[in-house]
Design a protein with these regions (language model features):
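Bacterial N-terminal signal peptides
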Residues: 1-6
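Extracellular/lumenal and peripheral-membrane lipid-interaction modules
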Residues: 10-233
Length: 233
């Protein structure tokens, strides 16, 4: 359900089309879009704030995604109604996203679990303030290898979360390093936001019990004045 909260303006339908695109793209449970003023005819906004809950990116659920963009250029508004929305650039983009441990585990299971050679099963990762730990089984030839992992985490290329200097233990001492390296490569990156259609770059990760938060160097602040659009699933 969409709700437009503002005074009556002729371009409300255009911005509703914009929100509709992100709702269809991300399948959020809730969404809030706030704009400082109307877009110009080229699709440029002065200031945009977006707050999404329960976003799905490539089958990975993000518990939250918050973005503040200034001087942001979209394609022409007349194209938005057809679901053609492109965000090409912005003068400033601040963002933060929190991903829950259970959603990372589900995403990895969907991507890597199986019974064949080179596949994982029963892998469970745990996130704590000091880092990540976990264990699972990796199929290599006729072997079913138990692998234990302890690792820090790092942001890579502005949109990915990777293991950082992982320490690995296996239940068979004669397993060569290339096997464990291959096993780890199957679950990397843990989080991949490259398909996120926004020009954002994340720089840091903060870990809490059961969650990881990726953020830009500065956190986005809410846009308190402007035209507000909301969506609830």
């Amino acid at each position: 359900m969409f709700v437009f909260i503002s005074f009556s303006v002729s371009y409300a339908d255009e911005v509703n089309d914009l929100l509709n695109f992100y709702v269809n793209k991300f399948k959020p449970e809730k969404a809030l879009l706030v704009i400082s003023d109307k877009p110009d005819k080229t699709g440029k906004f002065n200031d945009v704030y977006m707050e999404l809950t329960g976003v799905v990116i490539e089958k990975l659920r993000l518990d939250s995604l918050v973005v503040r963009m200034r001087g942001v250029q979209f394609n022409e508004p007349k194209e938005w109604k057809q679901g053609n929305v492109k965000c090409s650039e912005a003068l400033s983009v601040l963002a933060t996203s929190t991903i829950l441990e259970k959603d990372i585990n589900k995403s990895i299971a969907d991507r890597t679990f199986g019974k064949g050679d080179g596949e994982w099963h029963d892998l469970m990762l745990r996130i704590k303030p000091e880092g990540l730990s976990g264990s699972g089984y990796y199929k290599f030839s006729i072997l079913d290898i138990r692998i234990d992992i302890d690792s820090k985490l790092k942001v890579v290329k502005g949109k990915e979360l990777w293991l950082d200097e992982p320490f690995v233990r296996v239940n068979k001492l004669d397993i060569p390093d290339y096997v464990t390296n291959k096993a780890l490569s199957r679950i990397q990156p843990l989080v991949d936001l490259r398909k996120l259609p926004l020009p954002l770059t994340l720089h840091k990760v903060e870990l809490k019990n059961g969650s990881a938060t990726l953020s830009s160097r500065k956190l986005p602040e809410a846009l308190t004045k402007g035209l507000k659009y909301t969506y609830t699933k």
